[in-house]
A protein has these predicted regions:
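Short glycine-rich substrate-engagement loop in P-loop NTPases that contacts/grips substrate
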Residues: 1-14
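Walker B catalytic acidic pair
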Residues: 18-20
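Conserved catalytic/switch belt of AAA+ P-loop NTPases
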Residues: 27-51, 55-59
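Amphipathic alpha-helical segments of the small helical/lid subdomains adjacent to P-loop NTPase cores
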Residues: 41, 46, 68-98
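Short regulatory helix/loop adjacent to the ATP-binding pocket of P-loop NTPases
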Residues: 51-67, 81-82
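Accessory nucleic acid-recognition modules appended to NTPase machines
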Residues: 101, 105-264
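Active-site ExK catalytic segment of metal-dependent nucleases
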Residues: 263-273
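Catalytic cores of nucleic-acid endonucleases
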Residues: 271-288
Length: 288
């Protein structure tokens, strides 16, 4: 769109604009159009998770825009009977809806390759696809664990700041969730580094080379896989105001501590047949 003002000004009703990250001059124009008194048009802007897109939207359209994250399928959309394939394949539609497990795995492998070789560059991230691929695979081994940038950087042979920039890129493109610890003065030494999760369970399984339900079931990453999958499902279901994890060096931990409408809600996410009483709930409950 070479002349967005000329094209968009006459339009009324709902106007859909796709690939907005490729139109650097769009957002100042939308600001002018959004401020018209009669407000004849509403704009639905679609685009990939580009840092530049987010920056322009927040700067040019502050107070005029609502950001909506388009996620994959969740349990409420596919039904309880499809929970297991959702866990195995993840929520990307083409992966989940594939007729065969092998087709799903092939799609995820192709997605990862395309993301590394084309999408990151198109979104403004200037990093080596090979280096990022190695980092992403290594990060999957830390799925559900406390971030240790120095250790990961040392294993990859890069500087800690470089490892952090890789993590930032994956978080900004919604591939990774960085869950911060709950920081209050509890009189005990709290863990202060974030936990890291690969957000889509199917992508996590692909990075780990887990091709089937049997592979996942026998993998030492079974518990971590379920924890990450359940975490994303809970987060989408509860619509919390703030999200943390709670952990102290004595070993007490909540996988998810959500704040919603002034209430604290704690979750312990385990792959077990029957839940058991967890001491950390009592510890957390006694805190202010």
């Amino acid at each position: 769109m070479e002349n967005p003002m000329t094209v968009l000004k006459p339009l009324t009703g709902l106007v859909v604009i796709d690939e907005a990250q490729r139109m650097p001059g769009l957002f100042p124009v939308l600001r002018v159009l959004a401020d018209r008194e009669d407000n004849p048009a509403t704009f639905l802007i679609l685009g990939s998770a580009s840092p530049e897109l987010s920056r322009q939207a927040s700067e040019s359209l502050a107070g005029r825009v609502e950001l909506i994250e388009m996620r994959g399928f969740d349990q409420s959309e596919v039904g309880e009977d499809s929970l297991d394939p959702l866990w195995m394949r993840g929520g990307f539609p083409r992966s989940f809806l594939s007729k065969q497990e092998e087709d799903s795995m092939v799609w995820r492998k192709n997605f990862i390759a395309t993301f590394l070789e084309r999408d990151l560059s198109n979104l403004g991230f200037g990093m080596s696809p090979v280096a990022m691929g190695r980092f992403w695979t290594m990060l999957s081994h830390y799925h559900g664990q406390i971030w240790n940038g120095n250790e990961i950087a040392s294993s990859l042979g890069v500087a800690p700041n470089t490892a952090k920039s890789y993590l930032d890129a994956l978080e900004q493109t919604y591939m990774v969730r960085r869950l911060q610890p709950w920081h209050v003065n509890l009189g005990k030494r709290l863990v202060k580094s974030p936990k890291i999760y690969i957000r889509d369970s199917g992508i996590f399984h692909t990075l780990q080379g887990l091709r089937s339900r049997a592979d996942v079931q026998t993998s030492p990453k079974l518990g971590a896989s379920w924890e990450g999958f359940a975490l994303e499902e809970v987060i989408r279901a509860i619509q919390a105001d703030e999200l943390y994890f709670y952990s102290i060096h004595s070993g007490s931990e909540l996988d998810l501590l959500a704040f919603r409408n002034g209430r604290r809600i704690g979750f312990e996410l385990k792959f077990e047949d029957a839940p058991s009483d967890v001491e950390v709930f009592r510890n957390c409950k006694r805190r202010p």
